[in-house]
Design a protein with these regions (language model features):
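Conserved residues at the C-terminal ends of beta-strands
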Residues: 2, 85, 146, 206, ...
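His/Asp/Glu-rich metal-coordinating catalytic cores
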Residues: 1-121, 125, 136-137
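Binuclear metal-ion centers of metallo-dependent hydrolases, dominated by the metallo-beta-lactamase
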Residues: 29, 76-78, 90-178, 246-284
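Short, well-ordered alpha-helical microsegments
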Residues: 50, 72-73, 127-131, 193, ...
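A short helix-to-beta-strand connector/capping loop
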Residues: 18-22, 34-37, 163-166, 180-181, ...
Length: 284
């Protein structure tokens, strides 16, 4: 894993002991030898620290694991065998929008800041991506967040993200900003959506929206289709560019692995199988 991944994992679960001597972190592009194999991490455009893994054996066979990625800014690893994510592996999972969703999101937040605090709900990693988007767009209002989101955000800053003024929602500054409905952006995990900021402008970000880049889901609440995963077309394109002769689709986290394998065989004529055969758990 990368150092950033290790640090994020520890921030999310302090029971993990990832700084033990047996745990080795790697930099992107640095190859290490393990027995007769060589292992290299390749950057993936997903969240901070995300990486693809390339393993080369003594015979020159290249096996790659894509991890989670967005294809636009992820270098494709050419390989003989590819293990590819399948979060949006169904042909129904396509985002063919004619607008820049990131620009749309920034504009929506800027407009709603005129009315006070804006609440943004999403998942760890994606929340920090939105923070960086706003800072890059010169949105300078304070960012307010609960403890866990704050800890993840501080890790992101340690690894190069520049996120400006941050306040804990439980500190005096945070309480004054939220309690007084002053201009700020409050970042909360999606699990908090049911009970936080109910009387304010609210924006939820999710990759599971394919019909519209933005739609209203409540009186002052909107869903924005911002994803940190490739859609179906992006997954197919990655497989095509990888020139893999054999593909294994990840069928553990979501149930689209088998569908994606079938579509790879049909569209690309490449041998593909979903593993495990029975899906594991479903994640958002």
């Amino acid at each position: 894993m990368t150092k950033a991944t290790r640090d994020l994992a520890e921030a999310l679960d302090d029971s993990l002991k990832l700084r033990d001597a047996v745990i080795e972190t790697l930099e992107y592009g640095k190859t290490v030898r393990y027995g007769e194999e060589q292992i290299t991490l390749v950057k993936a455009d997903h969240i901070l620290g995300a990486a693809q893994v390339l393993v080369e054996d003594a015979g020159g066979i290249r096996v790659a694991y894509s991890g989670d990625f967005r294809i636009d800014d992820t270098p494709v690893v050419e390989c003989d065998v590819l293990v590819v994510e399948a979060t949006y592996g169904s042909p129904s999972c396509r985002r063919s929008f004619d607008v820049d969703v990131r620009e749309l999101l920034v504009t929506m937040i800027e407009k709603r800041l005129r009315g006070g605090a804006v609440y943004v709900f999403g998942y760890h990693g994606k929340l920090q991506e939105i923070m960086q988007l706003l800072r890059n767009a010169d949105v300078s209002v304070p960012f307010v967040m609960p403890q866990r989101v704050y800890e993840v955000t501080k890790v992101c800053e340690q690894h190069g993200m520049q996120l400006g003024c941050l306040s804990l929602s439980t500190d005096m500054d945070g309480r004054e900003l939220l309690g007084g409905n002053l201009p700020c952006v409050a970042f909360y995990h999606m699990n908090s959506r049911g009970y936080v900021g109910l009387n304010n402008a609210r924006i939820c970000v999710s990759g599971w929206e394919f019909n519209s880049p933005c739609r209203q889901i409540g009186d002052r609440e909107y869903l924005v289709a911002l994803s940190d995963h490739s859609d179906f077309d992006g997954l197919i394109e990655y497989v095509k560019r990888s020139r893999a002769k054999k593909v294994i689709t990840d069928n553990y986290r979501v149930s689209h692995g088998a569908v994606l394998a079938k579509e790879i065989r049909k569209r690309l004529g490449v041998s593909a199988v979903a593993m495990p055969r029975t899906p594991g758990q479903t994640t958002l």
